[in-house]
């Protein structure tokens, strides 16, 4: 009961598993906040700590055109599906353009009669209506045929979205985006292992601290598991060294156990015989 919260999480990923996947950003928001507003603060946070990624995989709520363009200014490529669906079988991305994105021809090769600039800076391209009327793909085409003209309008944003939708159909996009599913496993670990849904604190500040500590704990578990896997792989690749490694590990563990006992005994003796000076010694 009470005010609801949601946690935004960013983590690293490596396709070759040469490094553990670790959480690099945690932020707690009110439950009604939109995910679209969480991307840029997250990028600014990791950039300030020199942890900026080169690519960021996110779902469509984070991958709006404005977020993608602003992330590019931070040197980050956002890989995300676009919102909405393509309305025609032929899209803006199927037309041919110059390097400055001036429309040169339709997919079947018809060139525009003229191009005008609209009120908001977009382009209004006019084609020959008679030619469009004879086109075998007119039902699939976004060009609008009205009275004496056949026109199509677009701006930079519409063209970017069309190109992104076209890119989403490629094998390269599917291969890159499949790693995004890893964050779902992370959220599951935070819930099952760390109990992030059942915090014993209230208030935004306390919840943020608790969520950050939970994420830190998960990072420690992952780092330890990664180190154990790495050690086991090494033992499998070097069977002659496995016995030596086991002995060295046992000696190391025993040494640190004895050192811990010695420190505890020294502390007890110090507190017993030198208690008035203990605080001063700690400060020094």
Where in the sequence are the language-model features?
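Anion-binding and metal-coordination hotspots
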Residues: 1-284
């Amino acid at each position: 009961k009470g005010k609801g919260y949601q946690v935004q999480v960013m983590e690293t990923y490596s396709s070759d598993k040469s490094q553990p996947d670790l959480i690099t950003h945690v932020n707690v928001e009110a439950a009604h906040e939109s995910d679209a507003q969480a991307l840029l603060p997250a990028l600014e946070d990791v950039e300030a700590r020199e942890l900026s990624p080169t690519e960021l995989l996110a779902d469509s709520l984070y991958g709006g055109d404005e977020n993608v363009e602003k992330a590019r200014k931070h040197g980050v490529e956002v890989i995300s599906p676009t919102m909405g669906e393509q309305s025609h079988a032929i899209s803006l991305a199927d037309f041919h353009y110059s390097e400055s994105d001036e429309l040169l021809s339709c997919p079947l090769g018809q060139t525009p009669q003229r191009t005008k600039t609209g009120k908001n800076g977009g382009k209004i391209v006019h084609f020959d209506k008679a030619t469009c009327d004879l086109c075998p793909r007119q039902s699939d085409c976004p060009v609008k045929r009205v009275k004496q003209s056949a026109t199509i309008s677009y701006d930079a944003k519409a063209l970017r979205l069309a190109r992104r939708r076209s890119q989403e159909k490629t094998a390269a996009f599917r291969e890159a985006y499949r790693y995004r599913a890893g964050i779902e496993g992370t959220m599951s670990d935070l819930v099952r292992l760390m109990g992030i849904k059942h915090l014993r604190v209230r208030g935004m500040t306390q919840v943020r601290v608790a969520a950050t500590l939970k994420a830190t704990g998960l990072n420690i578990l992952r780092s330890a598991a990664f180190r154990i896997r790495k050690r086991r792989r090494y033992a499998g690749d070097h069977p002659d060294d496995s016995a030596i490694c086991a002995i060295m590990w046992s000696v190391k563990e025993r040494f640190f156990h004895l050192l811990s006992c010695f420190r505890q005994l020294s502390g007890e003796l110090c507190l017993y015989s030198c208690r008035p000076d203990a605080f001063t010694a700690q400060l020094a």
